[in-house]
């Protein structure tokens, strides 16, 4: 089931052992650390789960003590009242982690996601060029989508950091929790942590509009109120960037429309068609030579795109992306075929990520 990592000394104290695990995460560039009773620790490295050997199975007491040592009393009270908790945790110069705590079978389960201290550049992530041009736009809505763990937060952070280096803008982020930490360069940036600095995305978004923002980052558009307010913010002359757990461009447009009641949907289609600037849908694949690489579906708003959204024809967007590759649009299958043709990923891995394997197969044969 798992790969194996031999490393940690079993006799260490609980907190010392945890810090050693975090160091191991950094060394292996693991994306996640899983601690769950009654298993030994498990790291996810390049998308593969790997068991850390030489540590005895974690006990319920171990987990209680560890959680109590890394949360505030208020956070612990919240967890006891509602046994799910998400927060960020800094370990001085060692690491910054996004932590998710829950109970399973009566015991605490923890997942730690590693957040790199330095924000990666757009170039280093291999992001499409639209990430640079879109983030410099004065207004509109930019969406970064993909499944959990596909790097959406990192893409958004790279875009905001590029803006921070190139333009003077007032930026307000609303995150759950705050992941990457920005320092002011050319931009003035405020970061609000859901549950600590604000009660909800919707409330924070409404109040952000009163703070003279140029750019608003909404960590995730989770509900109808947040989506509606984000669209209105884009309509009133702000640049809004957010994320959704959708796998491609057409599904993204449909998901936004479908959260509204039927009597509202045509109006939302009209509004969305007017404010949307770009949708970047991404997924991660294992590289043949080790590590992972992103594949990106890219839609850039133009008159044809806006017309299809307005006329309830999101299913035709892939056709528009295919014929407008000269301006930077591309379908996911096109991105996957390029990765296979370049020898970066295997055909088998690409097929598993494609929503239309037969179409991808034809592209590869062509």
Task: Describe each region flagged by the PLM.
Residues 2-366:
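Short, flexible helix-loop junctions that flank or precede catalytic/ligand sites
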């Amino acid at each position: 089931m798992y790969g194996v990592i031999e490393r940690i000394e079993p006799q260490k104290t609980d907190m010392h052992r945890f810090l050693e695990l975090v160091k191991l995460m950094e060394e292996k560039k693991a994306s996640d650390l899983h601690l769950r009773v009654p298993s030994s620790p498990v790291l996810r490295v390049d998308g593969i789960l790997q068991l850390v050997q030489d540590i005895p199975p974690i006990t319920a007491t171990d987990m209680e003590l560890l959680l109590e040592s890394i949360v505030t009393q208020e956070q612990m009270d919240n967890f006891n009242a509602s046994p799910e908790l998400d927060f960020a945790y800094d370990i001085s110069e060692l690491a910054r982690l996004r932590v998710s705590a829950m109970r399973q079978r009566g015991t605490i389960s923890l997942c730690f996601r590693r957040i790199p201290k330095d924000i990666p550049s757009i170039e280093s992530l291999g992001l499409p060029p639209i990430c640079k041009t879109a983030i410099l736009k004065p207004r509109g809505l930019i969406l970064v989508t993909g499944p959990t763990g596909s790097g959406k937060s990192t893409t958004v952070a790279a875009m905001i950091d590029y803006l921070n280096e190139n333009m003077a803008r007032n930026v307000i982020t609303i995150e759950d929790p705050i992941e990457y930490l920005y320092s002011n360069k050319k931009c003035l940036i405020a970061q609000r942590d859901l549950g600590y600095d604000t009660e909800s995305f919707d409330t924070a978004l409404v109040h952000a509009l009163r703070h003279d923002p140029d750019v608003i980052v909404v960590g995730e558009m989770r509900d109808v109120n947040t989506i509606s307010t984000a669209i209105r913010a884009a309509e009133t002359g702000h640049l809004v960037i957010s994320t959704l757990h959708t796998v491609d461009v057409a599904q993204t447009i449909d998901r936004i429309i479908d959260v509204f009641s039927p009597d509202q949907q045509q109006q939302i289609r009209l509004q969305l068609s007017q404010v949307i600037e770009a949708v970047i849908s991404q997924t991660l694949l294992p590289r043949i030579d080790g590590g992972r690489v992103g594949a990106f579906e890219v839609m850039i708003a133009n008159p044809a795109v806006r017309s299809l959204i307005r006329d309830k024809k999101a299913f035709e967007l892939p056709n528009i992306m295919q014929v407008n590759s000269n301006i930077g649009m591309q379908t996911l299958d096109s991105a996957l075929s390029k990765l296979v043709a370049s020898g970066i990923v295997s055909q088998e891995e690409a097929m598993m990520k494609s929503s239309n394997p037969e179409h991808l197969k034809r592209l590869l044969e062509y």
